[in-house]
């Protein structure tokens, strides 16, 4: 995918663990303001790809560029500070904290001081903390979490905790969201609501989104473009409708789900 300005680019990523080739010369690009899907069967290398993009893993070969800058050697926190925000398949929320506390904790990635310093009001941070609390309330309301703002994450249903996880990602004021199976564990109604949220984040906030997802109807509905991995390699790429018809994709991953997935061309030029 080469149209428009590139927000994220990976070139020739190769990752090995001992004798296991996890990623094999993988390249992809994500254009600014687009929603791009990363799909494939279990063990295809999707999460390992995310780990390389965000700096958790250091690949043996390849490079990663973000917002026009080579970030290949930057640690995870520096990439986050540059504007990458990630959600996790197993959630990044802290169960012992309330929704508000989780969101405010995520905000501290962009404050220049620690959450502990903010909690204690050290160095005049109390004024900034007041601003953060106001911003956190706006984010919480945006995601419809106002009624549970003071509830500990451990007491919330799984779907609500996933929404909290996304609110935390947005709280870091990112340029790009990397979402790891955002629809996992959601009901069909919740997945439909998620699709609307993702489109609004793209259209209203101009966020760029790359998401790993097994929920084929969601991918078909919201993604402008899709990359398909299999055994650590790029199997194919294209618009959702093209991917759904691709015989190798059907054989490797989609199977009968392709016939029932709704959605067509993405409507982009």
Regions found by a protein language model. Give the residues of each.
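Glycine-rich phosphate-binding loops of nucleotide-dependent enzymes
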Residues: 2-269
